Amino acid sequence: MIRLGAPQSLVLLTLLIAAVLRCQGQDAQEAGSCLQNGQRYKDKDVWKPSSCRICVCDTGNVLCDDIICEDPDCLNPEIPFGECCPICPADLATASGKLGPKGQKGEPGDIRDIIGPRGPPGPQGPAGEQGPRGDRGDKGEKGAPGPRGRDGEPGTPGNPGPAGPPGPPGPPGLSAGNFAAQMAGGYDEKAGGAQMGVMQGPMGPMGPRGPPGPAGAPGPQGFQGNPGEPGEPGVSGPMGPRGPPGPAGKPGDDGEAGKPGKSGERGLPGPQGARGFPGTPGLPGVKGHRGYPGLDGAKGEAGAPGVKGESGSPGENGSPGPMGPRGLPGERGRTGPAGAAGARGNDGQPGPAGPPGPVGPAGGPGFPGAPGAKGEAGPTGARGPEGAQGSRGEPGNPGSPGPAGASGNPGTDGIPGAKGSAGAPGIAGAPGFPGPRGPPGPQGATGPLGPKGQAGEPGIAGFKGDQGPKGETGPAGPQGAPGPAGEEGKRGARGEPGGAGPIGPPGERGAPGNRGFPGQDGLAGPKGAPGERGPSGLTGPKGANGDPGRPGEPGLPGARGLTGRPGDAGPQGKVGPSGAPGEDGRPGPPGPQGARGQPGVMGFPGPKGANGEPGKAGEKGLAGAPGLRGLPGKDGETGAAGPPGPSGPAGERGEQGAPGPSGFQGLPGPPGPPGEGGKQGDQGIPGEAGAPGLVGPRGERGFPGERGSPGAQGLQGPRGLPGTPGTDGPKGAAGPDGPPGAQGPPGLQGMPGERGAAGIAGPKGDRGDVGEKGPEGAPGKDGGRGLTGPIGPPGPAGANGEKGEVGPPGPSGSTGARGAPGERGETGPPGPAGFAGPPGADGQPGAKGDQGEAGQKGDAGAPGPQGPSGAPGPQGPTGVTGPKGARGAQGPPGATGFPGAAGRVGPPGANGNPGPAGPPGPAGKDGPKGVRGDSGPPGRAGDPGLQGPAGAPGEKGEPGDDGPSGLDGPPGPQGLAGQRGIVGLPGQRGERGFPGLPGPSGEPGKQGAPGASGDRGPPGPVGPPGLTGPAGEPGREGSPGADGPPGRDGAAGVKGDRGETGALGAPGAPGPPGSPGPAGPTGKQGDRGEAGAQGPMGPSGPAGARGIAGPQGPRGDKGESGEQGERGLKGHRGFTGLQGLPGPPGPSGDQGASGPAGPSGPRGPPGPVGPSGKDGSNGIPGPIGPPGPRGRSGETGPVGPPGSPGPPGPPGPPGPGIDMSAFAGLGQREKGPDPMQYMRADEADSTLRQHDVEVDATLKSLNNQIESIRSPDGSRKNPARTCQDLKLCHPEWKSGDYWIDPNQGCTLDAMKVFCNMETGETCVYPNPATVPRKNWWSSKSKEKKHIWFGETMNGGFHFSYGDGNLAPNTANVQMTFLRLLSTEGSQNITYHCKNSIAYLDEAAGNLKKALLIQGSNDVEMRAEGNSRFTYTALKDGCTKHTGKWGKTVIEYRSQKTSRLPIIDIAPMDIGGAEQEFGVDIGPVCFL
């Protein structure tokens, strides 16, 4: 583009115009001329087709460019008429005075448009055809003077013009001069004076430029262009009409046995069955009408204050867990072809801020900062809740009398006084006459729902309904991730051109194409850069010598140079993003024992241990030292208002106030008297039966019906042909550990252990009594053959054999097995904490501790039975008048009035005193999971719970360290001696076997040593409330309550007999074992025990050197036992023998010293109530207690004497009018209670009414929240648990998308599903929902086998489900819960095929090539076989190879919800170049 400042633009134009003038004399048709818009221009001609565009003819090429203006440096620039660039108005100012010297040539004026200033551009019209060339126009009028240009360089000397007559002096003009007139001095087309030999005169002024001529004729037709590249294949057209039937095939082989026939007709109903178990409790009934508010209950007795718990010490913060290991590197990508080096682009705009990086590890603690400046006082806090009323203060001293006040103004009229108390009841009048019969009462309320009727007989099965019409095509699923590039497909047939799509984004720059044929002349392009200087024209006649010119401007830029050598290598690029993680490798061999990991996350709390023995009460601790003085507390909240001060003097009367805001809506008026009930209407005559209605339109296809009852057992089919062996399945996950097997026989004797350290020499035992002579044993039988020893180590390698001949080349091998496991990985991070193990068995009892000190005073005994009430005493004398009592508490509220309309929510009231505990409400649903709080300080240990039922046997623990030797058991019978095998070398490790069948329960293992105490885990989430447990035992003794007020002295009771000793109470539950006490002092040597039974045979010592065999002597009698020899060396440690039977109990040892007092045991259950004790002596009266709570109003006392009449009150304000018609009937009563008394009795205090409105609003809001929890609405904020729940709560809602949260808790992991409200099914969408249609698998092997799409095919994937926005594992967790909450699941998938069999092979007439599908628990479902693992085909369009796309719809239903959803599919009939497939995955639905 040419970029010109307003003033500089003239310089370039002057040059260009000069070039024009040089060539004006040449022939118009000479070579190198240009044709544009029907007008021919000579080589090097310059012209402006529009005010902001300039063109030059360069050896036959038209080069045009836009003039780019620079902004002038002034406030209000203006664009002169016909110009392109704005200039400052100062440049337009006229200069007065004489005509100045002639300026340099200016830019040619543009006189094309004299209409007005430039308008805004209009919308682009369609391009018109080129018009025919117009005639040359007349010369245009003189253009408006252009702005003054800068001094141009001297032009090339022009041809001398004819001499003009001298002109008269001109008028004063613009300072720029009339450059149009100056330009007229050049030659135009008709000026040829130099060639005619006319004498040259001075150059005349240049004439104005003529208007443009009419448009030229259209250019010649261009050559035919190359054919375009073939278009993209069009979208598949709709399926064509069904072709004509083919010729009849050969008769097929005998088919396989047919499927079982339809169910037979329904049998007669069976006999009445035995009564069933009680049904599960019914659903809660419909919410009843809101009851009227009940009367206020009596105030409950104050509960005993609970013992204050000890505050636990706060736990230490756990150390941060180790950072997870880095993921495995993905496979290395294939190297792409090197791209051509691109030119450096312009710097882009700075990109948007990237997402925040991952949170870095926490930095080390910084140094403590200097104390900041004192902050400004904060804003006054909101008023805190009103504190509980303080205890009444001591009465103050009377104040000194104040000065007499000035007499006040008369006060305003008081409010009318409250109605006086009711007078004494009058004497009963005589009975009245019976009244007239009353009008019928209003309609009674509907009775409660009747009990549920018994279930009816099952109905006869209905007939199968028609198949519904095909549903509408579902919405397109979300676009899947781009698959891997497929192999190049065959060239498709030429598609019809599609409609024009929207303009796509610009593609990358393609490689240059071959040179095309020349096209038609296009529209004028944007102005090009000035071309190179053309070749010199023919030499003209020599002109006269001109004035020497100034040195010329630098020439136009030269041609582009050759491409330079490649630059140096650029700087290292940024590290690319991590590749996608590679497929999981097979598990490597187990790594070496890693270093001990950091302590794992705290496990879940183990089950509650058995109750320990009750400890003794500990001593009371000493009082702690006083703590340091605390920092001054924060300013307290504003205290409650003080008591009202004495009345001030009355102020002057204020001005009339503005009207107050409208009050709350008043309470509803008293109900009117009931209207008379209408008479009972007569029964209407039954109408005639209507004519049958027209047949309705065909309904939409119904949703799949519920699963029908199973059909009758079909006949046994003939045995099917043996199936082809399936491919090896993937290695199964390790099965769960079976229960421990029965105790195996003792193993072979182990290798000798290292020699143990010498034990402490035991005291020498007493010599045992001589044992009786045993009977002679029979010689033992030959032992059975010993077990085969393990295989020996491999022998040494043999010598190399001779080299064999070269064999023939083998067939192409199948895909190799997976490679060897990679090198051992680094030690993994510590695994998550396991669940807590079962509680260890009780430890050995510790030595008995010392006698503890006396315990604290025991609990008070249960109160004795109530004695009979004494007779009332005689009336005492009247006491002295007491001091005036404190102001009584507010009386009890009257009966609740009818509820008024809800007022606006008032400000929150002060906190009321807590009411008595209500009965426990039904358990609410779990609320949304709160944000995890900080760990609280550990609570105090709870009281031990009741003994739980025995837990399931735990897994066998590692054997603990050996316990102390048990007492020797009696010897077992002599076993048969086996031949001792040699100890074999260990065999090579076998492959992992399949899990065995569960063995019988093993005997319990040895007692393990108690494990180290784990760190305290964070509190688990609050579980759902458990069932109400049995009543707990009484708590510990409470701290003594404040002294109550002294009771009235009772009459002294008669002294009772002494009661009998009560029955012994049930023993308390054993407490937890105390920690072992310190060892007591050694007791005195006990008496010698009786000889113990003979112990079992000790392990054999090491074999001695073999002696020479002596001759066999006769069997001698058993000799007497010899003297005890010296202690031999310790033999090798034998294997632990079988557990001996427990020995007889030894004699009790001496009483050990008392151990220290154990912790206090749980309180035992209360014993039976003992008989009353004797009356104690009267106690000293206690101190006067604080005044008790205000008692209930007493009964109305007897009527007092009438008081003296009071002074008359001021007249009250006029009352509102009342419509007495409502009460007209009330005045006509003769007797009976005042009917208005109920209206008056419940007039609420105005303050109470204000309070009630706020309470009502709060209750209403709470009620709404609770209602939304009890009856969720399926929104994201308030998701349901399943669609079945939604259907139960809102049966009228329509099917559609809703949110569910099966695992409850926090709603952030809720997922959107489709709820079928007709059936209650919950349907989860797959993500993605389609497998693109293409050739996924190529194989040259003739052997066909099933190939799993997600596991084996390149680019395949396992199907996943749920919202793609959720964290990866969230949907799996939610699906697990959804499966648990459901009893049946179903899913459809559609297999799109091209030359691939999906279900039935029509040619072979069997299902051998049918797909396999894999459920989420890795079970494979097939087309035939066990009916529990077979799927059905709803539609089968893939039965033969046709070269066209077809589809088969497969459905799988099961009541084993763990098998759904489908996660993989394995076709068999694939692998050829023409064989393609794709899959549409339907949603999985659970009910």
UniProtKB/Swiss-Prot annotation:
Span of the signal peptide: 1-25
Q: Where is the VWFC domain?
A: 32-89
- Could you tell me which cysteines form disulfide bridges? C1283-C1315, C1323-C1485, C1393-C1438
Q: Where are the transmembrane segments?
A: none
Induction and repression of expression: Induced by mechanical load in chondocytes.
Q: Principal localization?
A: secreted
Binding positions for Ca(2+)?
Answer: D1301, N1303, Q1304, C1306, D1309
Q: Spell out the residues of the site Cleavage.
A: A181, Q182, A1241, D1242
Spans annotated as Triple-helical region = 201-1214
Chain positions with 4-hydroxyproline modification: P659, P668, P671, P674, P908, P914, P920, P1181, P1187, P1202, P1205, P1208, P1211, P1214
Modification 5-hydroxylysine occurs at: K190, K287, K299, K308, K374, K608, K620
What's the entry's take on its domains? The C-terminal propeptide, also known as COLFI domain, have crucial roles in tissue growth and repair by controlling both the intracellular assembly of procollagen molecules and the extracellular assembly of collagen fibrils. It binds a calcium ion which is essential for its function.
Describe the protein's quaternary organization and the partners it interacts with. Homotrimers of alpha 1(II) chains.
Recorded disease: Defects in Col2a1 are the cause of a phenotype resembling human spondyloepiphyseal dysplasia congenita (sedc). Homozygous sedc mice can be identified at birth by their small size and shortened trunk. Adults have shortened noses, dysplastic vertebrae, femora and tibias, and retinoschisis and hearing loss.
Identification of the protein by name: Collagen alpha-1(II) chain
| Organism, as annotated | Mus musculus
Gene of origin? Col2a1
